[in-house]
Swiss-Prot record:
Annotated EC: 6.3.4.4
Cofactor names: Mg(2+)
CDD domains reported for this sequence: AdSS
Similarity field: Belongs to the adenylosuccinate synthetase family.
Record-linked InterPro entries: Adenylosuccin_syn_GTP-bd, Adenylosuccin_syn_Lys_AS, Adenylosuccinate_synth_dom1, Adenylosuccinate_synth_dom2, Adenylosuccinate_synth_dom3, Adenylosuccinate_synthetase, P-loop_NTPase
Binding residue positions for Mg(2+): 64, 91
Pathway info: Purine metabolism; AMP biosynthesis via de novo pathway; AMP from IMP: step 1/2
Subunit structure: Homodimer.
Function: Plays an important role in the de novo pathway and in the salvage pathway of purine nucleotide biosynthesis. Catalyzes the first committed step in the biosynthesis of AMP from IMP.
Protein name: Adenylosuccinate synthetase, chloroplastic
């Protein structure tokens, strides 16, 4: 086998439902059978219709895997699409039937489908101006949002001051940048944990809103010398949020009740995860992580639904690996090789525009994510980006510096930074596969690559992305 790029070694592969209750702010949804008519001729109908009543789409790398596209494709089969965590730091790029591009951050990707209700759960953090900006952008492009989005009354509010604090905190860390999006996500979750945050339901009590917001301002001013605060700023912000409160009111709902009633009524719910497991506050490469739980556990805590109701979970994984910002990346390709993947895959962040670091698919990290989440299947995305490479590598195991093989993905950052990756080398393929829609029509080398990933991860690949459009998807 050819020598591995970068560090490492290579070797060749050897309960009964109650009476119907209308969802708040939405016309009574058409039964699932009705929506099935539109996709009856779709060869993927059986694969999609077999998904559980409550299913989820979660990232299984460091984000940017292409979750939004799969959610967009699956959404017509579901009554509700729900976000359970994160905020505007999560970027989802989707395309409508005319090929128009939409870059969403907080609004769930199901918004392009008129029969789908979108829910932003209690585990998310809401920057109200940004939320309205997304809605205005959608509506200006002909996408109706009226009565189609519900925001949890328990979700926390993310203020501009959180974004200011985010930048000040990052500057304080000097050479130890976590690489945040500076969208205020971490400071907002910090306010939540220290119990001085404000929630969406506080917008219904403007008589006490100012006093609560004052505590946040004072706290930031006491903590950061660079944070300038005056009572005039507070007054302006309160007046601003009075206007926001009036506009947001039709969107506010007790989403815990809505979702659980919907489950009892046998409605289908698709959970759209933001970020990914390798950025999870508990399971990710801490401290280079996000501030919430983008893994399976975050579904329950971020929506208020029980673990027993969750069925199929689909892990989304790129055919290679990318990462934005700092943090360990064992299979990273530096220099020209990384540039080739970056340019071919147009690897620049949806939210930040930052160039993504690129490398080979890390099977050790993928298996770790599969263990944590219990994925029933995988969606392998951007397989087309690998076309034209003479050979493709899979990082199948890690060795420590002393040569001893690691038995699991290490939690210790120092250990992870020093691992030596063992690679399998597989043959590449020359042909452009972006127009292929049947698994059997893929080049033999591409099929072997997919099947080797299945073997190593122990989870079947049911969906294969071969381009950005919603139709550029192979069902296996």
């Amino acid at each position: 086998a050819a020598a591995a790029a970068g560090r490492g070694r290579s070797f060749s592969p050897a309960a009964p439902a109650p009476s119907s209750v209308r969802l708040p702010g939405r016309q009574a949804p058409a039964p699932a059978a009705a929506s099935a008519l539109a996709v009856e001729a779709d060869p993927a109908a059986d694969r999609v219709s077999s998904l559980s009543q409550v299913s989820g789409v979660l990232g299984s790398q460091w984000g940017d895997e292409g979750k939004g596209k799969l959610v967009d494709v699956l959404a017509p089969r579901f009554d509700i699409v729900a976000r359970c965590q994160g905020g505007a730091n999560a970027g989802h790029t989707i395309y409508n039937s005319e090929g128009k591009k939409f870059a969403l951050h907080l609004v769930p990707s199901g918004i392009l489908h008129e029969g789908t209700l979108c829910v932003v759960g209690n585990g998310a953090v809401i920057h109200v101006p940004g939320f309205f900006g997304e809605i205005d952008g959608l509506q200006s492009n002909g996408v109706s949002c009226d009565g189609r989005i519900l925001v949890s009354d328990r979700a926390h509010l993310l203020f501009d001051l959180h974004q200011t604090v985010d930048g000040l905190r990052e500057a304080e860390l000097a050479n130890s940048f976590i690489g945040t999006t500076k969208r205020g996500i971490g400071p907002c979750y910090s306010s939540k944990v220290t119990r001085n945050g404000l929630r969406v339901c506080d917008l219904r009590h403007m008589d006490t809103f100012g006093d609560k917001l004052d505590v946040l301002f004072e706290d930031a001013a006491a903590r950061f010398e660079g944070f300038k605060y005056s009572k005039g700023m507070l007054k302006e912000e309160v007046e601003r949020y009075k206007r926001f409160a009036e506009r947001l009111e039709p969107f506010i709902a007790d989403t815990v009740h809505v979702l659980n009633e919907s489950i009892r009524q046998k409605k289908k719910i698709l959970v759209e995860g933001g970020q990914a497991t390798m950025l999870d506050i508990d399971f990710g490469t801490y401290p280079f992580v996000t501030s919430s739980s983008p893994s399976a556990g975050g579904i329950c805590t971020g929506l208020g639904i029980a673990p027993r109701v969750i069925g199929d979970l689909i892990g989304v994984v790129k055919a290679y690996t990318t990462r934005v910002g700092s943090g360990p990346f064992p299979t990273e390709l530096l220099g020209e090789e990384g540039d080739v993947l970056r340019k071919a895959g147009m690897e620049f962040g949806t939210t930040t525009g930052r160039p993504r670091r690129c490398g080979w698919l890390d099977i050790v990290a993928l298996k770790y994510c599969c263990d944590i989440n219990g994925f029933s299947s995988l969606n392998l995305t951007k397989l087309d980006v690998l076309s034209g490479l003479p050979e493709i590598k899979l990082g199948v195991s890690y060795n420590q510096m002393d040569g001893e093989k690691l038995q699991s993905f290490p939690g210790d950052l120092d250990t992870l930074e020093q691992v030596q990756v063992n690679y399998e080398v597989l043959p590449g393929w020359d042909s452009d596969i972006s127009s292929v829609r049947s698994y059997s029509e893929l080049p033999q080398a591409a099929r072997r690559y997919v099947e080797r990933i299945e073997e190593l991860a122990g989870v079947p690949v049911h969906y294969i992305g071969v381009g950005p459009g919603r139709d550029a998807l192979i069902y296996k």
